[in-house]
Amino acid sequence: MASSAQNATVSFCQEKWNHFLDVVGDEPERLWVYGTVLLIFIIYWLYAAVLTLVDFTKKPHFVRKYKLQPGKNDPVDTKRLLPALRVVLFNQTFVAIPLAYGLYHFVYKYQNTLNIRELPSIQQTVFDLALCCVLEEIIFYYGHRLLHYGALYRYIHKKHHEWTSPIAVVAHYCHPIEHILANTFPIALSLGVVRAHLVTGWIFFAIATYNILSDHAGYAFPWSLISVPFHDYHHATFNYNFGVYGWLDRLHGTYGAYDKSGQIEASHRPQQKQE
């Protein structure tokens, strides 16, 4: 019974995928480059718009009890927000499109020989996504820690840390080099190593975009992933929680968490912001 249902699901998805490609075309470069950039852009701004509306209207009222770092950046400073949005848009267009083009021609084009029209099995998709998560954690953790050292922090990563109590829409507010090294490479290179199918890549980019918005939203909803308070804690303390999922932070002793009252552990409180 389960096998029949799975086969029916795969057949349905394959049919819809073929129809989609019949409409938009099945040229790999166009799909990997512009399809990926457009997917990220749509998910980012739709979800960010909802969360930004919550930030400005403070409605629905029940969400306020899930606010992390209450009283900070509340209300949102629009004078800081508007320039930040320009940076976000720059990163998502003038940085992202050439980067996606380069990644396709130097990574995906040679690493991936899969038939773009033939969807992978459910088992293969789940396995590839799980492996990508492990690789993403490794690449992001060590890359992120590197960005906290000396000149790399001062001239590149510090820009992102201007928001010690961030909101969702500034998730991509960062130096262009950081957008390449931290926001894109951990995901894109993981997919290249795994040699994932385009659809698996889109699923992974969609999940990653949702996660980065949730991680910077400033709200720990009941349905939020554990990474939400985890990454918010990083913005509040600077020197803890460098990873995506916390696995390597626990290994290297850089893991931190808010106490039951929502306060930063005393020994983790920064004396001053890094310069």
What does each model-found stretch correspond to?
Residues 1-26, 30-34, 53-63, 67-76, ...:
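Cytosolic/stromal cytosol-facing helical appendages immediately following the last transmembrane segment
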Residues 96-109, 133-154:
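Transmembrane alpha-helix/helix-exit interface in multi-pass inner-membrane proteins
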Residues 34-38, 85, 126, 130, ...:
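Hydrophobic alpha-helical transmembrane segments
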Residues 38-48, 89-104, 131, 182-189:
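Hydrophobic alpha-helical transmembrane segments of multi-pass integral membrane proteins
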Residues 41, 55-109:
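N-terminal helical submodule of small eukaryotic multi-pass membrane proteins
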Residues 76-97, 117-137, 171-172:
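Alpha-helical membrane-spanning segments of integral membrane proteins, especially the hydrophobic core
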Residues 2-38, 94-125:
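Long, highly hydrophobic alpha-helical transmembrane signal-anchor segments
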Residues 120-141, 145, 201-214:
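Membrane-embedded alpha-helical segments that form the functional core of polytopic membrane enzymes
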